[in-house]
A protein has these predicted regions:
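N-terminal mitochondrial targeting presequence
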Residues: 1-28
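Ligand-binding clefts of soluble mixed alpha/beta catalytic domains
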Residues: 24-562
């Protein structure tokens, strides 16, 4: 996850209309944090070390398949995948990369970034979803997580009306993994289904072919609204020369079978022939520049935006890396929102959850943050706040650090199950964009009530210290003690659960959209809100800007069990 210069200016240009001026002046949140205390310094050092470790992993992943593979690509006169990306994007504009550590330590082979670069950036003045095959990683083959990463990018593009740009160079499915790549609903074929569906919705699909595009991969350029192919470099065919010979006896070279000249002059599969990578990318920029203003419009933030009163660097010492250590979520909010101003809702009721209104980079947002375990009053308060934001069409930001809902006879008699269900239902049915940042723990049903992945937030990011699981390893150890008397089994399971709960484990499996630094939270969320402000300029939606599941279209909230 990284940003180029000009983030503030770029956020202002995402939309085309101005927000109405806010008429109130929320209170600046106070801060009692001592940045010289031993506790603060200890937490900060631990967080700094963790971020340094993740930075090293991210830097390695961005090298793709390594120096040898890169040199092989250069020797063929090709630009590297990230060089193509840099040439495509407008200079000095932010690029929000998604899931850069996908597939980290998942497969026996090293598959950095799952062999795919995805992210949101500006092309010819227009925000686009960019999907780049990294042919330095196993020839750009599709592993199960490669497919999952591309489908997630398409999901984000569809929700926000972002044109998709596919920079293609791929050998297709990784055959040893074909059982988990090819046949099911959310496998390889879904990529092409999504392209067809988005094109039908008026969301442009543009591709540029820089190398081989074989078998199912041939349908990426074939299904694109408009495409470009590089001469003597791009190849599009359903079956390569060896398979053609085996099937038909015909002997033919790959250029004659599926090269750029043939497809541009005879088959008509491609629309433009480029001399090299540079020209192909320039042509794609021209295509995006000619899309016009059809599709989606946005809302500009307020012209005058205050930065937070307090330094974002202090977040490292406030939160630390141990999710068992409590902190006040207001100290996080005050280092993220404009002017550190926050109009808190129901401050004295349900105090284990913090709710209120703020602005981030000028965009209005309703914030729900945890300050401990969720009790019935906390759940009811959050439910009411979600209903308010839904009614007022204010996006929701969930700042998550939750151990779950309260348990025990008193809680059960008090109706924690039905009250928690109200909150979960409200989150599921809220018809406004939801953004989630896990800043600490996200355990048990608390994950559901705080807009976990299953509840279709527009984006879900994790801080490096974040943990996610059915329960914490300490709680699990206590449960195991009651059901098993083998101490060695307890230790092994606790270690395994601890490992599987980390942010790195999560992001490698695409349970989130990437790990972000605490100091980047304001800008990342600001870009998310800017994208969420985009609304269809036409269509049959009765309420524009509403958020639905990928394949759901439910309206309203259903029945709350009182």
């Amino acid at each position: 996850m990284f940003f180029k210069a000009g983030t503030r200016r770029a956020l202002q240009k995402v939309g085309l209309q101005k927000c109405s001026k806010r008429l109130y002046h929320p209170t600046v949140l106070p801060s009692l944090i001592s940045t010289t205390s031993p506790e603060f310094i200890s937490k900060k050092e631990a967080m700094d070390d963790l971020i340094e470790e993740l930075d090293a992993k991210t830097a390695k992943a961005r090298l793709g398949g390594g120096a040898t593979a890169q040199e092989r690509m250069r020797s063929r006169g090709k630009l590297l995948p990230r060089e193509r990306l840099a040439l495509l994007l407008d200079p000095h504009t932010p690029f929000l990369e998604l899931s850069s550590l996908a597939a980290e330590d998942v497969y026996s082979d090293y598959i950095p970034g799952a062999g795919l670069i995805t992210g949101i950036g500006r092309v010819s003045g227009r925000e686009c979803m960019v999907i780049v095959n990294d042919a330095t990683v196993k020839g750009g083959s599709y592993y199960p997580l490669t497919v999952k990463k591309q489908l997630r990018a398409q999901e984000i593009a569809r929700e926000h009306g972002l044109p998709c740009v596919y920079i293609v160079e791929s050998g297709g499915a990784a055959l040893p993994h074909q059982a988990n790549v090819f046949p099911d609903r959310e496998h390889f074929g879904r990529i092409f289904y999504n392209m067809a569906q988005m094109s039908a919705l008026g969301i442009p699909q543009i591709s540029s072919i820089h190398g081989i595009s074989v078998a199912g991969g041939a349908y990426v350029p074939a299904l694109a609204d408009e495409n470009v192919i590089v001469q003597n470099q791009g190849r599009i065919f359903l079956a390569g020369p060896p398979l053609v010979k085996a099937a038909t006896g015909e002997e033919i070279d790959d250029e004659s079978l599926g090269g750029g000249m043939m497809h541009s002059t005879e088959s008509g599969v491609t629309d433009a022939l480029a001399r090299d990578d540079n020209e192909a990318i320039i042509r794609v920029r021209g295509i995006i520049g000619d899309l016009g203003q059809a599709g989606y419009r946005g809302v500009l933030p307020e012209e005058k935006v205050e930065g937070p009163v307090y330094s974002a660097e202090e977040l490292h010492g406030i939160v630390g890396t141990d999710v068992r250590q409590p902190f006040d979520m207001r100290d996080v909010i005050s280092r993220v929102v404009d002017g550190s101003r926050f109009r808190e809702f129901k401050k004295d009721y349900g105090s284990s959850i913090v709710t209120g209104f703020a602005h981030i980079h000028g965009y209005p947002v309703g914030i729900i943050g945890n300050n401990g375990i969720l009790f019935s009053p906390s759940a009811l308060k959050a439910t009411q706040f979600i209903l308010l934001c839904s009614q007022r069409q204010i996006p929701l930001l969930f700042l998550v650090n939750v151990a779950g809902y309260m348990v025990g006879s008193k809680a059960e008699k008090g109706g924690i199950a039905k009250d928690g269900a109200k909150m979960v239902r409200a989150v599921a049915c809220a018809d406004v964009p939801k953004l989630t940042v896990i800043v600490g723990g996200s355990f048990g049903a608390g994950n559901y009530g705080m807009a976990g992945r299953a509840y279709s937030p527009r984006f879900l990011w994790m801080w490096p210290n974040a943990k996610i699981g059915v329960m914490g390893s300490g709680q699990l150890s206590q449960v195991m003690t009651s059901v098993s008397k083998d101490p060695s089994q307890h230790a092994t399971l606790k270690s395994e659960i601890e490992h599987q709960s980390t942010a790195l484990y999560s992001t490698a499996r695409l349970w989130d959209d990437g790990i972000i630094k605490p100091t980047d939270t304001r800008d990342v969320v600001g870009l998310g809100l800017a994208l969420a402000s985009r609304r269809p300029s036409s269509g049959n939606q009765s309420r524009t800007g509403r958020s639905t599941t990928w394949d759901g279209n439910g309206m309203g909230f259903g029945v709350f069990r009182m």
